[in-house]
Regions:
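Short alpha-helical transmembrane segments in multi-pass integral membrane proteins
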Residues: 1-20, 78-143, 187-243, 299-366, ...
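N-terminal transmembrane alpha-helices
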Residues: 7-45, 58-73, 77, 102-109, ...
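Transmembrane helical elements of multi-pass membrane transporters/channels
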Residues: 18-37, 139, 150, 173, ...
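Helix-terminus/linker motif at the lipid-water interface of multi-pass membrane proteins
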Residues: 28, 32-50, 120-127, 183-190, ...
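Small-residue hotspots at the loop-to-helix junctions and early N-terminal turns
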Residues: 47, 51-58, 137, 196, ...
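Small-residue-rich hydrophobic transmembrane alpha-helices
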Residues: 50-110, 147-166, 273-337, 370-384, ...
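Hydrophobic transmembrane alpha-helices of multi-pass small-molecule transporters
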Residues: 62-65, 177-181, 207-211, 283-286, ...
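Short runs within selected transmembrane alpha-helices of multi-pass transporters and secretion channels
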Residues: 71, 140-158, 166-174, 195-208, ...
Length: 471
């Protein structure tokens, strides 16, 4: 019998695309909201408020990435258990994961409230926006529990093959947030505090809605008394996935921060060009990023169900889809780089336009590299090897940072070296990830999926792989 959200049956290509589209729509919706929120704050309150919200957003992303990493890691475990048809284990994992991430959320909230002022001073927030940023963050972090609840249940529903429901609740949240922004800022004149309150109310609505939906509509995910016990094996498995996913997210943010610092050293023109180009860049590769996340859930469910042949066919299908889509996007970005930059830059800002166009044409040629890398991230998370995803992230961003600083220091190369370091990092990580897939990962996955050990220590796996490679 085909279960709702079951990715272990049906046509592979159709299943992958149908599961990806709502996730992609959600990401696009979130990006559109970010742009709309920026415009409302900037146009209706002023430049200082815009700077405060922008700076606060960077800090929020870093802190909330901890919760996102925990939810993503838990989602992989949920997918494995759902694919295996072990609903009892799934419910126990839901309970343990909820307690774990809920506890981290509370501790994070307490830490922010206790050390918000020292954090802002460490970030060297200018005096003229200090109070604005502090007030905004103080209100926002009262609602962090809603961020936890929405992301937890969204990850759970996606893990069991439902990527549509989280999209609907996100859409309601975005529309409500924009409406409340306009009402609280324009009508009630609440300023930046009104923007923060609007965000918290919208997040609370989405969190409450998705929680009630899961409880009422998905009875197989509803916890029973016997499920509410602290299972150490579930905690160990969830922690191993979630911790590594958090490390991956932190490494990504830190690497991006270091490159941003180098870009800033070249002055405001380069900073402006980079800021505009990165917005276009993130939109361009967003589809392959979401496809990689959908692919991870597909692999995890089939890995849990021990459907090795379907996994292999899924890998081939996913790579083909990624290649075709990446090439199309590469062509569009390469040939329309200048018109795309003109969305954010005035025609008379010739130098900004030139630098941004150069960036997009260099990155655009290599979108296949980032597309494959997202597939590799998702694949290794799904087959119980999240550590390999971390290794590839460190390799990609480490290469980017080292090459950026080295190439940018050469006068004849300069800032262009930063642009080239990014795809070089992607391609190097791709090469390592694909070689590992060919020579090691398939053997390791086969050992685990055939019950050699449910979750053996990595050293044991690698030792067995080493022995299997000997002549």
């Amino acid at each position: 019998m085909l279960r709702k959200g079951d990715l272990t049956q049906g046509g592979i290509t159709t299943t992958l695309l149908q599961f990806t589209l709502p996730m992609l729509a959600g990401s696009l919706l979130q990006q559109c909201y970010n742009i709309a929120d920026t415009l409302i704050v900037g146009q209706c309150i002023g430049a200082n408020a815009l700077a405060a919200v922008g700076s606060a957003y960077t800090l929020m992303v870093f802190l909330i990435s901890i919760l996102l990493g925990l939810s993503m890691g838990s989602g992989t475990v949920f997918s494995l258990q759902y694919g295996a048809g072990d609903l009892s284990a799934l419910r126990r994992s839901i309970y343990v994961s909820f307690l774990l991430i809920g506890t981290v959320t509370i501790l994070l909230n307490v830490a922010v409230f206790l050390w918000l002022d020292p954090i802002l001073r460490w970030l060297q927030v200018p005096y003229d926006i200090y109070s604005l940023m502090r007030n905004y963050l103080w209100i926002i972090f009262w609602g962090i529990v809603f961020t936890f609840l929405y992301n937890f249940y969204a990850a759970l529903l996606r893990a069991v093959g439902d990527s549509v429901t989280p999209l609907w609740f996100l859409a309601v949240s975005v529309v409500l947030n924009i409406g409340l922004d306009l009402f609280l800022i324009l009508v009630l004149d609440q300023g930046i505090e009104g923007a923060a309150v609007a965000t918290v109310i919208a997040q609370g609505t989405a969190a409450s809605g998705i929680l009630l939906y899961t409880y009422k509509i998905r009875p197989e995910l509803r916890l029973h008394r016997e499920d509410m016990r602290f299972d150490r094996s579930s905690l160990r498995e969830i922690t191993s996935f979630s911790t590594l996913t958090c490390v991956q997210q932190s490494v990504m943010n830190f690497g991006i921060l270091m490159v941003q610092g180098l870009v800033n050293s070249f002055g405001t023109v380069v900073m402006a060009a980079f800021a505009a180009a990165v917005k276009i860049d993130s939109f361009a590769y967003m589809p392959v990023q979401e496809f990689g996340n959908a692919f991870s859930t597909f692999i995890a469910q089939n890995f849990g169900a021990r459907k090795g042949d379907r996994i292999r066919r899924g890998v081939r299908s996913a790579f083909l889809i990624t290649i075709v889509f990446s090439l199309i996007i590469s062509l569009l970005v390469f040939f329309f780089a200048k018109p795309l930059m003109l969305i954010f830059v005035r025609p008379d800002e010739a130098e900004i336009l030139r630098i941004g166009t150069e960036y997009l044409r260099i990155e655009g040629v290599f979108y296949l590299g980032i597309g494959i890398l997202f597939l590799l991230y998702g694949y290794y998370r799904a087959i119980r090897m999240p550590g390999m995803s971390v290794v590839l992230t460190i390799l990609s961003l480490g290469t980017r940072v080292v090459l950026s600083y080295w190439l940018a220091s050469i006068p004849t190369i300069g800032v262009t070296g930063i642009w080239w370091s990014i795809p070089i990092g992607w391609l190097l990580a791709d090469a390592v990830g694909m070689l590992y897939y060919k020579y090691c990962a398939l053997r390791a996955a086969n050992m685990q999926s055939h019950g050699l050990d449910k979750n053996p220590p990595p050293i044991y796996i690698y030792y067995r792989i080493f022995l299997s490679l000997q002549p």
